[in-house]
């Protein structure tokens, strides 16, 4: 039982070390970009991109990173299973939404006009 606990403890320590490396890489990217602001912009941008990619690579090696990759793969599989609407269905739905939006805007415009006249009648102010 204690051997299993020790194995879990070392696994957690390794996970923590990976996240610390990720944090250090991101901090180096930010601080390095600030300290070397006199260097050419493309070189700084390339260095930042490389450091962020390295941090992302290390993050993907963690347990949460592996779970994220698995989730992304499952999501991609689910997207493939979706029955997408045809072009005609999409066009009809879009036209219905546009028509309902136009009708609602006219109703709200009329209601606003009525309320403005009512308030101006009650308060005696003219707008």
UniProtKB/Swiss-Prot annotation:
**Chief place where the protein resides:** membrane
From which domain of life does this come? Bacteria
Please give the Gene3D superfamilies that the UniProt record associates with this protein. Preprotein translocase secy subunit (1.20.5.1030)
- GO BP terms: intracellular protein transmembrane transport; protein secretion; protein targeting; protein transport by the Sec complex
In the record, what terms sit under GO molecular function? protein transmembrane transporter activity
Which InterPro entries is this protein grouped with?
A: SecE_bac, SecE_sf, Translocase_SecE/Sec61-g
First and last residue of the signal peptide = none
**Protein's cellular compartments:** Cell inner membrane
Which NCBIfam families does this chain map to?
Answer: PRK05740.1-2 (NF004372), PRK05740.1-5 (NF004374), secE_bact (TIGR00964)
| Protein name, per record | Protein translocase subunit SecE
Question: Organism source for this protein?
Answer: Salmonella typhimurium (strain LT2 / SGSC1412 / ATCC 700720)
């Amino acid at each position: 039982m204690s051997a299993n606990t020790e194995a879990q403890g070392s696994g957690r320590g390794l996970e923590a070390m990976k996240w610390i490396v990720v944090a250090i890489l991101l901090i180096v990217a930010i601080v390095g970009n600030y300290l070397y602001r006199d260097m050419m912009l493309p070189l700084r941008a390339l260095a930042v991109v490389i450091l962020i990619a390295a941090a992302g690579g290390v993050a993907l090696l963690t347990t949460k990173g592996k779970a994220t990759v698995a989730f992304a793969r499952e999501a991609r599989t689910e997207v493939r299973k979706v029955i997408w609407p045809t072009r005609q269905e999409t066009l009809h739905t879009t036209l219905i939404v546009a028509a309902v939006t136009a009708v609602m805007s006219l109703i709200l415009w009329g209601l606003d006009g009525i309320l403005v006249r009512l308030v101006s009648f009650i308060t005696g102010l003219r707008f």
